[in-house]
């Protein structure tokens, strides 16, 4: 089997950039490596996800049950695995994923306030994707930890450049995003993810973004010992 490394984090945390840099570095080192990104919007399997995020099943994130929403995302990952990277992975290749089941965990668990319901959901999701669907379990998860206030500022800048609303019911709900950001802490502890800080406070107690290179080096150091 191969190696599966996940880059996780909220919007604006730089997952795509860090995925690209890690793939480039590992390729230069002679590793067989490919990248994937979820949801895979180029696949027909992602159509229900597009409808969900566009609010066609309900304008509020709580309108769709976490188990139903999770099923949509699981099918998308299953289709990607079976058609795009299963053979490469099973032959020992390294897969760098921009989001994975990990995103489903955080975005859906926050729909529950009760800790027992959250734990039951996470247990179910692990069994559903990694056993029922047979998807690979990650070897490492790097959480690109971006302070929410910085992330929202970056998202506002990005939205301004692209001309308005992203059409994503998740991104449009501030209270939901706060809950997601806070819930990452629970997942870091439960699954022993690698936390990679994307911003640090300066002497004026203001957040300052770390450089892309600094973040990349932290990601690399977190996974280098896993490489074949």
Q: What are the residue ranges of the model-derived segments?
A:
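A glycine- and Lys/Arg-enriched "phosphate-lid" helix/loop adjacent to the NTP-binding pocket
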Residues: 102-182
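Extreme N-terminal, non-catalytic leader segments
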Residues: 1-3
């Amino acid at each position: 089997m191969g190696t599966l490394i996940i880059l996780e984090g909220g919007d604006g945390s730089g997952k795509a950039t860090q995925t690209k840099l890690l793939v480039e570095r590992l390729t230069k080192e002679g590793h067989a490596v490919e990248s994937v990104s979820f949801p895979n919007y180029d696949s027909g399997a992602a159509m229900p996800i597009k409808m969900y995020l566009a609010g066609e099943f309900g304008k509020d994130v709580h309108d769709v049950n976490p188990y139903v929403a999770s099923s949509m995302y699981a099918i998308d990952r299953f289709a990607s695995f079976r058609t795009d990277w299963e053979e490469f992975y099973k032959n020992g290749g390294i897969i760098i994923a921009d989001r994975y089941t990990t995103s489903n965990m955080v975005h859906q668990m926050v729909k529950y306030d009760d800790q027992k319901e959250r734990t039951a959901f996470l247990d179910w999701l692990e069994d559903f994707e990694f056993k029922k669907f047979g998807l690979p379990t990650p070897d490492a998860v790097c959480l690109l930890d971006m302070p929410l206030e910085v992330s929202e500022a970056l998202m506002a800048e990005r939205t301004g450049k692209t001309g308005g609303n992203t059409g994503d019911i998740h991104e449009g709900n501030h209270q939901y995003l706060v809950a997601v950001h806070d819930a990452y802490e629970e997942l870091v502890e439960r699954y022993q993810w690698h936390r990679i800080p994307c911003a640090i406070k300066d002497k004026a107690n203001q957040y300052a973004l770390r450089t892309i290179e600094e973040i990349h080096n932290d990601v690399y150091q977190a996974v280098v010992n896993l490489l074949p």
